[in-house]
From Swiss-Prot:
Provenance organism: Brucella ovis (strain ATCC 25840 / 63/290 / NCTC 10512)
Name this polypeptide is given: DNA methyltransferase CcrM
EC number(s) reported in the record: 2.1.1.72
SUPFAM superfamilies: S-adenosyl-L-methionine-dependent methyltransferases
GO MF, one annotated term: DNA binding
Gene name as annotated: ccrM
Length: 386
């Protein structure tokens, strides 16, 4: 998968404005579209991307020069693309690109927007006003932030990410909870993430040794975002592509990407960077899932498959309680009938019970949980493409 550039208006492949509204995926998938993000997004089909990562201009122009204690100059963001006449102008810009993003986002898709205190609250307001539903705010704590050289404020050591679904009804969005938990030593992943800023060999430099892009994000940050909220084969959109971190990480992790960028030097750097990436293999990309992600199996399916017969006696692993399987898929015990969960709870005097793990059947003198039979059904469903 080599990245192609759809230049706007001069093209190495095709002109962005030549892309029909219902352009086939191959016309823009794994591509960098050159141009203004709003205009370029208008050429993509409705509901065509799974996840959006947006790193918009922060509007953080600094007044005057900044110097370190040794009087060396601090390299601040002074690019023209980060300049806005007023908050109103920035709000109008934000609303325009968010509206365009919302149209191309799938109903079950999600968007991530990163920013600093200069802009993230204004972005959050626009997200809510446009109908997006906020899922989390994530704090990226920097292990090596820039000091506050003037000593007039706290050291700014974090940036904020907002994660949102397309709307409140956007059910079924991807969140790889089990994978995130396993990666965090089997503890729930928190909403504060600790990563260093992009430095060293990862930082793109030009022939003079200067930074290619002033706000290049670390690949580890994008990798966590994609591993948390997407699946292999999903389409990741970055409307402010910059140096191509999103594309590089997407390619490595087996996701598709589409980037939008108007500055040719950034496009050149991103293209070379992405073309040098080697994708991981299928085994390395398999996402860990939990039971909530597995297909639902009714207890009657176990009986219909002939794995249990009416009249079978089930018991708990210590043989303290027993119940009889009935033909209709219910259990009966102590004169009461109900589901495997209800009867499991009733015999123990509990309010709830997982009947799949509580009830056991005997095979060759060995007790086994009926959950083992459910696993067989799920394997059959997977083999049949269910």
């Amino acid at each position: 998968m080599r990245s192609q550039v759809i230049e706007y208006p001069m093209s190495l492949v095709r002109l962005a404005h030549e892309l029909p509204i219902e352009a086939p995926r191959t016309a823009w998938l794994d591509s960098i579209i050159k141009g203004d993000c709003v205009s370029a997004l208008e050429r993509l089909p409705d509901h065509s991307v799974d996840v959006i990562f947006a790193d918009p201009p922060y509007n953080l122009q600094l007044g005057g020069d900044l110097h370190r204690p040794d009087q060396s100059m601090v390299s601040a963001v002074d690019d023209h693309w980060d300049q806005f006449e007023s908050f109103q102008a920035y709000d109008a810009f934000t609303r325009a690109w968010l509206l365009a993003c919302r149209r191309v986002l799938k109903p079950n898709g999600t968007i991530w927007v990163i920013g600093s205190y200069h802009n993230i609250f204004r972005v959050g307001t626009q997200l809510q006003d446009l109908g997006f539903w906020l899922l989390n705010d994530i704090v990226w704590r920097k292990t090596n932030p820039m000091p506050n050289f003037r000593g007039r404020r706290f050291q700014n050591a974090h940036e904020t990410l907002i994660w949102a679904s397309r709307d409140q009804k956007g059910k079924g969005y991807t969140f790889n909870y089990e994978a995130m938990k396993a990666a965090n030593d089997d503890v729930q992943m928190r909403s504060d993430w600790l990563f260093p800023i992009c430095t060293g060999s990862e930082r793109l430099k030009d022939e003079n040794g200067d930074k290619v892009h002033p706000t290049q994000k670390p690949e580890a940050l994008l990798a966590r975002i994609m591993m948390a909220s997407s699946k292999p084969g999903d389409v990741i959109l970055d409307p402010f592509f910059g140096s191509g971190t999103t594309g590089a990480v997407a390619k490595r992790l087996g996701r598709h990407f589409v980037g939008i960028e108007r500055e040719q030097p950034y496009i050149d750097a991103a293209t070379a960077r992405i073309n040098a990436v080697e994708p991981l293999g299928k085994a390395e990309l398999t996402v860990m899932t939990g039971k909530r992600a597995e297909p639902r199996v009714a207890f009657t399916s176990v009986m219909e498959a002939g794995l249990l017969r009416p009249g079978t006696v089930l018991c708990d692993e210590r043989r303290r309680f027993a119940a009889i399987v009935r033909a209709d898929g219910t259990l009966t015990a102590n004169g009461e009938a109900g589901s495997i969960h209800r009867i499991g709870a009733r015999v123990q005097g509990f309010d709830a019970c997982n009947g799949w793990t509580f009830w056991h059947f005997e095979e060759n003198g060995v007790l086994k949980p009926i959950d083992a039979l459910r696993k067989i059904i799920r394997e059959q469903m997977a083999a049949a493409g269910a």
